[in-house]
Amino acid sequence: PLFLVETMAPQLKITRLMCARQSFVKSRAPLEDNAFVLMEYDNGAVGSMWTSAVNSGAMHSQKVRIVGEKASIEWWDEHPNQLSYEVQGEPARILERGMPYLSPNALADDRIGGGHPEGLFEAWSNLYRRFAIAMDAADRRDEALLADFWYPDARAGAFGVRWVENCVRSADNGAC
């Protein structure tokens, strides 16, 4: 889920978070099957992330919402090809994957064009493709490409582990 948050708003840095987690299915305890995370960012924006394996009607749901001063964005894995973009005082806009109005970065991992749903295999394929591009650039010492090329590297993995640890610490301390 953190990967989704970072992909949606890579320029934002999380400064504070608060987590609540639950184990609704007792046989899964002590592992949680539902969690809510509230996040504050360095520019004053706030975000929320909800992940659940028990939300009736939404199997293994993950929802990410980031709220800023002027606009909000929301992504939900039940509608993975859509991103809701909501500007204050305007109707919500649904941005569809693969459409020409998206930025080149948004289109870079599009495999089969808009209107056709992509899935888990394409997502993994995109990650492996990005790893391969980064490894090739590193072998060629192409610092220019690596400076602007985003992929989940070891730093992202370590940050993700720290993020989960902070979520656990927050929930264990009864932050909610």
Where does each model-flagged region fall?
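C-terminal glycine/acidic-rich active-site capping loop/insertion
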Residues: 36, 41, 70-155
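Alpha-helical scaffold segments in carbohydrate-active enzymes
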Residues: 160-167
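Rossmann-like dinucleotide-binding domain that binds NAD(P)(H)
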Residues: 1-46, 50-59, 155
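A general structural signal for well-ordered alpha-helical segments in protein cores
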Residues: 1, 128-132, 164
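C-terminal capping/lid region of NAD(P)-dependent oxidoreductase domains
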Residues: 169-176
